Amino acid sequence: MSYICVIGNENGIVAGSDSRETIAPNKFLDNRQKAFVDKKQNLIWACCGITKYNGIDYIDVVESILRDTNLSFIEKIDRLQIMIERVTKECYNYIGNGSAMDILIGYKLKRKILIRMNIQNGEVKRNTFFAPLAIEGGSGKMIMNKLPLKDYNHLSLKELEVYVKSRVQKTIDKDKEISINDPTHVNTIGGKVRTVAL
């Protein structure tokens, strides 16, 4: 399912992801963009999970909603939640196995707000935090030690970006190592590391 993370502090917010997309069982592409920024709207986000279903690319739909300048921030979040709830529930009911999407959003106001939405089989967990903080999503968070709860304020924006790149790369490497040692493990985290900064 991939790995995404967002870290914010007083200097800004950085989002990072791997670039692997599962197109069929054990068939992958390694050029999927999952981390985005819209500097005009002070938004940054990363998403992973159910990518395409019934001919619809849901990462593109998430991007379209978050870039829509006619919606307020709250309207965007609510619209995302309703849409992904519906599609993960429908997919789960049709396919019969787990269907999930993680969306991490950073919003730069006077304080930086980080939102984590985990939608699994139509059930939503949504949390809002204030930076400095790090949040993560995707299956990669299950194979790595949790991102440390520490004060990230001492890091410059460039240092935050280096930290995020390193974290994503370590997760890609760990998933590959697990798949080498366990033939039943599907290596769904891979490709190049992508980061964006706000």
Question: PLM features: residue spans?
Answer:
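Conserved short S/T/G-enriched processing/targeting/catalytic segments and their helical context
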Residues: 2-92, 125-197
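Generic beta-strand structural signal
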Residues: 8, 37, 107-108, 119
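Divalent-metal-activated hydrolytic enzyme cores
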Residues: 91-94, 110
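Short hydrophobic alpha-helical segments used for membrane anchoring or interfacial signaling
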Residues: 104-110, 196-198
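Structural motif
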Residues: 111-115
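A short, sequence-level motif marking secondary-structure junctions
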Residues: 118-124
